[in-house]
Amino acid sequence: MNPDLIRTVQMGPWQHKVDDGLDARKTAYETMYTLIDTCLSKLELQAFLDRVVAGLIDTSDEIKVICHMMLFRLSQLAPVAVTQKLDDATPHLDKTMKGATMTKDTVKQDLERAAELQRSAVRAVVALSKVGGGVSPKFDALVDELKRNPTWSADFKESTV
């Protein structure tokens, strides 16, 4: 993310941040997702996974969802490479599962978007747990926490079937 591409726009009494680089980043991550199916054998997987993990901390929820989908797909196609990056990805997945801070002004659309992002993260964690169980203590703690959490345990069990 390039902070030079973020500008603040005045809309009446409110200020709104506009990310002029979002479309380019989104296209780049969608292209990366396509590369997984078209030329995985030609990719330098560790560098590729570094970019996927970097996408997990992007400010855009859309990019995070694409990265969750990439982790899901890579856990099936390149499990060894993915397990090597579990320690790097776990804090970002955990932060997503903790959710955004909600205030009294939070609108229903924002709540739904946050819930969809968390469901996407659960799907990624379930896929990663199938290949990375026991490899990373941090990741195992996240999996246990999700299984015990009343909000996410049903989604977790549903995704493991």
Residues covered by each model-derived region:
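Hydrophobic residues within the alpha-helices of tandem HEAT/HEAT-like
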Residues: 31-37, 55-56, 67-81, 93-97, ...
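Eukaryotic intrinsically disordered, low-complexity regulatory tails and linkers enriched
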Residues: 91, 114-115, 120, 127-161
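Amphipathic alpha-helical interface segments within eukaryotic helical scaffold
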Residues: 19-40, 49-53, 70-71
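HEAT/HEAT-like alpha-solenoid repeats
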Residues: 1-16, 42-56, 81-101, 135-152
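Extended alpha-helical scaffold regions
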Residues: 6-8, 62, 71-76
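Acidic, Ser/Thr- and Gly/Pro-rich intrinsically disordered linkers and low-complexity segments
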Residues: 1-24, 97-120, 158-161
